């Protein structure tokens, strides 16, 4: 019986790696820099070297390894083909076949947000559930949809791109994707800050935020907890947009639980309770009791999800 597996989370600045037992026990984690020079051609070389070195260091034979699972910051088709990965400089190629040939081990790949959602379902905030939607509120808004324990990636690997649900009809500013009115423009860490600056410029009511040199999502939520009316308006607006988007998703896939993660989620239940309030207001009545949980694995969700990709469970 194979005893070990590797989980890999490729980010724009670092590649996170984990060696696991097949029961989900994390034995060791580490990271290396993401070398994006020359269209990221060194990335898989570095991953292959790290895996080979770790096997030698731990005296683990390849026959004892179930495989390697990878989260990639871009769409990945069902056969392991990266369709485009701007952050890494990658064009279209099959990452599973390429890395598998380099290390002589089975490889499975998926979009990083989907893979992180799989990790949270397995060992994190979604543990015990089979139908999970994860929303990651960071620099952008990512998402992952898990139904019956399986990632829903869709035809083009774009399933779960929650951040690009349209929530504002007449927005003039453009989202990073090139469209307008996307959830990511308002619910990401950068989006919340941008919205705060807009509100401060048109609403002259007193606010702690006016005294802060560098406004962040954290300072906004801290001010809201302290009773700042303008900050609370920002949190309510954020909660309404997220709640509305999740209500739409619930009509399509009817999850058991929404798992909220990413840096913005550090606001904790203050944020979750506002999202839930607007979710219940907007959701189809049969879906109103969907649970909300905070993510628990933090930056390790990607490596947990990676190894879960290659486990036959």
Predicted regions and their residues:
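Adenylate-forming
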Residues: 117-122, 143-145, 164-165
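Structural signature of FAD isoalloxazine-binding scaffolds in flavoprotein oxidoreductases
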Residues: 158-162
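Short loop/edge segments at beta-strand edges and connector loops
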Residues: 109-111
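Short hydrophobic alpha-helix segments
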Residues: 30-32, 86, 155
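ATP-binding/phosphotransfer module of carbohydrate and carboxylate kinases, centering on a glycine-rich
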Residues: 1-66, 76-79, 97-107, 119-129, ...
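Generic beta-strand structural signal
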Residues: 105, 130-135, 139-143, 147, ...
